[in-house]
Regions:
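Helical cap/lid subdomain of alpha/beta-hydrolase-fold lipid enzymes
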Residues: 1-172
Length: 172
């Protein structure tokens, strides 16, 4: 791979913790994906996503210069954000394998607007089970759909609580 191309794509494939990030709040985050990505609506949405021409050119060059290194579906095109949200996505599975650094405090705010027949609630896009992350110091369920979780008064109150706590702990 050309050195300039390697430098360009490296940040997309190699993740390093940022030492100045001390706290993370996940809001309606599908850590384990969403079944909607695998259903008709997700497939239709994925088909409408167009790669920028420069990304397609980079992808084509990498595949051409590394024959047999990619799964057939990745040889054809890069996965879309919808593809990555499929629960069995290899990329999503790899991301789940990354660990949050020990110096980072994590919180989850999870939408829970409905109960499914299987007993797992969710925000109509992300099931609660997908939004849960082991090791968070706080988890709040908000009675809101996915597109409204971020604006819900319970979310705003929880964010304010977390920010005040962070200020107290850091002495800022």
């Amino acid at each position: 791979m050309r050195p300039d191309l390697r430098r360009q794509v490296k940040p997309a494939y190699f993740f390093h913790p940022l030492p100045f990030v001390k706290r993370v709040v996940f809001i309606a985050t599908p850590h384990s994906g969403s079944m909607l990505a695998s259903l008709g609506v997700g497939r239709a949405a994925s088909l409408t996503v167009q790669q920028p021409p420069e990304m397609k050119a980079i992808h084509d060059e990498i595949v051409r210069d590394n024959p047999g290194s990619f799964r057939p579906d990745y040889e054809r095109s890069l996965p879309t954000t919808v593809d990555v949200l499929e629960p069995d996505s290899m990329i999503l599975q790899s991301l789940r394998g990354l660990r949050v650094p020990c110096w980072v405090t994590t919180h989850s705010i999870i939408g829970n607007a409905h109960q499914s027949p299987l007993g797992d609630g969710g925000d109509c896009i992300v099931p609660v089970s997908s939004a849960r992350l082991p090791g968070v110091v706080s988890e709040v369920l908000v009675p809101a759909k996915h597109t409204k979780v971020h604006h819900h008064p319970d979310t705003i109150a929880e964010l304010e609580r977390i920010l005040v706590q962070h200020l107290r702990e850091t002495g800022l």
